[in-house]
Amino acid sequence: MFLAINEMKHSKLRYALVIGVVFLIAYLVFFLTGLAYGLAQENRTAVDKWQADRILLSDEANGKLNMSMLTMDDYESVKAEDKAALAQFPGIVYQKGKKNQQIDVSFFGIEADEFLAPNLVKGRMFKNTGEVVVNDSLAKEDGLQVGDQLKVAGSKQTLKIVGFTDEAMYNVAPVIYMSLADFQEIRFNQALPKEAQKINAIVVRGQTKQVADNLENQPDSYK
């Protein structure tokens, strides 16, 4: 011990550099851990809010939400304590008149009276054609407000913001909630009757009593 202390006294610069390197490595690990956790949260906060017990996808989707395609007949075939239809699609929007300021988003098509409907921190739930509720990051980072209109890239559809929710991110993109009917127009460029609408998943709370053979069970840890 005496020799070690004596060596450190005579080589202060060398040991200071060693301590500095160890500190920088520890800081880098801390920084990367925080970054990874933040990205993981932004990848699925909207999903966590569902508090779902099961997410049913098509059996050919390989567990991927955006690759799943279901019909309303599939939805009706599921017998469960509580269920909700979900349609999802990534997209790009921009404020009307500001096409150069494009924003990556994730569209969620839902029914406003089902449990997938988001909590509101401002405004109201959508109820008319073209109305949407969006994550509040679009207000904080992009300056959007209730009443603003959004254009959808690749579509003639115009969306009107009527409410804001919080902690609604999916695949590191803010979520825009809309009716299933509006979603069909954006996704398929046509209005579809209720019975012909396409969805990506059936989200279940509680016990699932009956599931068709073409559906695949995903646990609540779905990412």
Language model: regions and residue ranges:
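Solvent-exposed, non-transmembrane alpha-helical starts
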Residues: 65-69, 104, 117, 128, ...
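Extracytoplasmic
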Residues: 51, 100-105, 115, 129, ...
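The feature marks short, hydrophobic/small-residue-biased sequence motifs that occur predominantly
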Residues: 75, 80-127, 177-180
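N-terminal Sec/SRP start-transfer signal
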Residues: 1-30, 40
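Membrane-proximal extracellular/periplasmic loop immediately following the first transmembrane helix
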Residues: 45-94, 104-106, 210-214
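Short, solvent-exposed hinge/capping segments at secondary-structure junctions
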Residues: 110-118, 134-148, 183-188
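Mid-to-C-terminal secondary-structure elements
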Residues: 137-177
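Mechanotransmission and gating elements of multispan inner-membrane complexes involved in transport
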Residues: 164-223
